[in-house]
Amino acid sequence: MSKVYDWFEERLEIQAIADDITSKYVPPHVNIFYCLGGITLTCFLVQVATGFAMTFYYRPTVTEAFASVQYIMTEANFGWLIRSVHRWSASMMVLMMILHVFRVYLTGGFKKPRELTWVTGVVLAVLTASFGVTGYSLPWDQIGYWAVKIVTGVPDAIPVIGSPLVELLRGSASVGQSTLTRFYSLHTFVLPLLTAVFMLMHFLMIRKQGISGPL
């Protein structure tokens, strides 16, 4: 076993990586409120796991979406628990994200040289809100349908580009199958991928610059 470790150590410098991860300086002023970002990340990971589990049963069609959600809740093994955890962690993620933004703002964590960390955080906040909008529609019940109709109709007030933008969001002139397909693709592929990329950037900058000092 030692020879195997030495082989990898010689090529990858595993010990140096481990030392960098475990020996990072933590300022003495850090308290429990500095854990809000980490809790948000944990909620995101729970979302990914539970969301992936539900894709085995969910059917993104206007005729079968609601019935598939009902199947998850009433017949699939532990489906009710998985979907409930997904919903609870979604609410928790939004709450923790908001509190995290307030904490960073109130402690001046957005100031030089951490402006880009703040920018990526704002992008992540927008992505989190987008998760809520797209996920809300997926059961395709009355609440989800009318929420999508209202949200996608908002850009219609923009001069010139409003109507084309609405049609782009809906996939057609009215809310229907194309809209659900778009929102499902955004919720399960586009948004998670963008969130993972911006989270990686966010954490790498935090690792590089460290935690901001007290005011």
UniProtKB/Swiss-Prot annotation:
The way this protein sits in the membrane is described as: Multi-pass membrane protein
Question: Molecular function terms in GO for this entry?
Answer: electron transporter, transferring electrons within cytochrome b6/f complex of photosystem II activity; metal ion binding; oxidoreductase activity
Key words of the record: Chloroplast, Electron transport, Heme, Iron, Membrane, Metal-binding, Photosynthesis, Plastid, Thylakoid, Transmembrane, Transmembrane helix, Transport
Listed GO cellular component terms?
chloroplast thylakoid membrane
Q: What else is known?
A: Heme 1 (or BH or b566) is high-potential and absorbs at about 566 nm, and heme 2 (or BL or b562) is low-potential and absorbs at about 562 nm.
Q: What is this protein called?
A: Cytochrome b6
Q: How does it assemble?
A: The 4 large subunits of the cytochrome b6-f complex are cytochrome b6, subunit IV (17 kDa polypeptide, PetD), cytochrome f and the Rieske protein, while the 4 small subunits are PetG, PetL, PetM and PetN. The complex functions as a dimer.
The family note in this entry says: Belongs to the cytochrome b family. PetB subfamily.
Q: Which cofactor does it need?
A: heme b; heme c
Q: Which free-text remark accompanies the cofactor? A: Binds 2 heme b groups non-covalently with two histidine residues as axial ligands.
- Positions bound to heme b 2: 86, 187
Q: NCBIfam families annotated for this entry? A: PRK03735.1 (NF002990)
Please tell me where heme b 1 binds in this chain.
100, 202
Q: Which residues cross the membrane?
A: 32-52, 90-110, 116-136, 186-206
Q: Does the keyword Transcription apply?
A: no
Q: What does this protein do?
A: Component of the cytochrome b6-f complex, which mediates electron transfer between photosystem II (PSII) and photosystem I (PSI), cyclic electron flow around PSI, and state transitions.
- Entry keyword Heme: yes
List, alphabetically, the Pfam families matched. Cytochrome_B
As recorded in Swiss-Prot or TrEMBL, the protein's gene is named petB
Source species: Oenothera elata subsp. hookeri
Q: Which GO terms describe its biological process?
A: photosynthesis; respiratory electron transport chain
Q: Which residues bind heme c?
A: 35
Q: InterPro entries annotated for this entry?
A: Cyt_b/b6_N, Cyt_B6_PetB, Cytb/b6-like_sf, Cytochrome_b_N_euk/bac, Di-haem_cyt_TM
**Which cellular compartments is it found in?**
Plastid, Chloroplast thylakoid membrane
